[in-house]
Amino acid sequence: MTDRIYLTSDGYNRLKEELYVLVHQTRREVLEKIAEARAHGDLSENAEYDAAREEQSHTEARIADLENKLASATILDPKQIKTDKVYILTSVKLKNLDTPDEIIEYTLVSSEEADTDSGKISVRSPVGRALIGKAVGEKVQIVVPKGELHYEILEIFVK
């Protein structure tokens, strides 16, 4: 049984688009590569054939993964997200207690939508796990691979 995953409608649509491209474009291209490599003769020492079969395996695995994720996805409406505590899809403004001038902001999302470059962190990350369920004013200590982080939650909101 697959765990439920929570996505924004944008995140759901991105996964759906990726699946569409894999099924209707990539899969066909890989099959063409396999057919072309097969035409070269002896398959026992055909690196081109082996590479195409490997690509097919990766493509089919990703298709299966996306189908499972989309089937178990719950699309969250940002308008219905509470801001009394940190939940998935909330944004959090944090004060770094080790460097008081540093204020950072994260939005907690599913692993499938995480993108640290745009401030979207997974609820399953060390920071995400430490923040879930916390309220404004609470201090959190987060153990990460580089050591410990200490933050105070200044604001919880939905973008």
UniProtKB/Swiss-Prot annotation:
Any GO MF annotation of the entry: DNA binding
Gene3D superfamilies: Transcription elongation factor, GreA/GreB, C-terminal domain, Transcription elongation factor, GreA/GreB, N-terminal domain
Signal peptide bounds: none
GO biological process: DNA-templated transcription elongation; regulation of DNA-templated transcription elongation
Pfam families assigned to the protein according to its UniProt record, in alphabetical order: GreA_GreB, GreA_GreB_N
SUPFAM superfamilies: FKBP-like, GreA transcript cleavage protein, N-terminal domain
Keywords (A to Z) from UniProt: Coiled coil, DNA-binding, Transcription, Transcription regulation
Coiled coil (UniProt feature): 45-75
Family per similarity comment: Belongs to the GreA/GreB family.
PANTHER family, alphabetized: TRANSCRIPTION ELONGATION FACTOR GREA
Function: Necessary for efficient RNA polymerase transcription elongation past template-encoded arresting sites. The arresting sites in DNA have the property of trapping a certain fraction of elongating RNA polymerases that pass through, resulting in locked ternary complexes. Cleavage of the nascent transcript by cleavage factors such as GreA or GreB allows the resumption of elongation from the new 3'terminus. GreA releases sequences of 2 to 3 nucleotides.
Entries under HAMAP family matching the protein: GreA_GreB (MF_00105)
UniProt name for this protein: Transcription elongation factor GreA
Organism in which the protein naturally occurs: Pelodictyon phaeoclathratiforme (strain DSM 5477 / BU-1)
Record lineage: Bacteria, Pseudomonadati, Chlorobiota, Chlorobiia, Chlorobiales
